[in-house]
Amino acid sequence: MIELAELAGRLGDPELTILDVRSLPEFTGERGYASDPRQGRIPGARHLWVAELNMGRAEQIRELVGLPEGAEIVAYCHSGVRSADAVEALQAAGYRARNYVGSWHEWSRRADLPAETGASEQPK
């Protein structure tokens, strides 16, 4: 598990991959939950829908993620539930994965934290 303060302090860290496992409209900020004061994603996050992770074997997951086994990944969603499933799959595939339990529900409430919206360049 990772807390907000640690994640916020590591934005831009090239050794950490932030993985948003929500739906694509949630990731881009086109749709979200009315309870959140803003929509979007954590800056620098990559998108990979949780259903894609849960349907694959370890080698398939590594191919989807595109990172070497052992890479450090933080997964988040809206409230930490989908990302908990994602972390389980990522760990089974050999990643050092942690769940940001507060997820977008917590991040979106902090006006002092940056957010991105729209399409994103996904690393290949």
Segment roles from a protein language model:
Residues 1-17, 21-124:
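Rhodanese-like catalytic fold shared by cysteine-dependent sulfurtransferases
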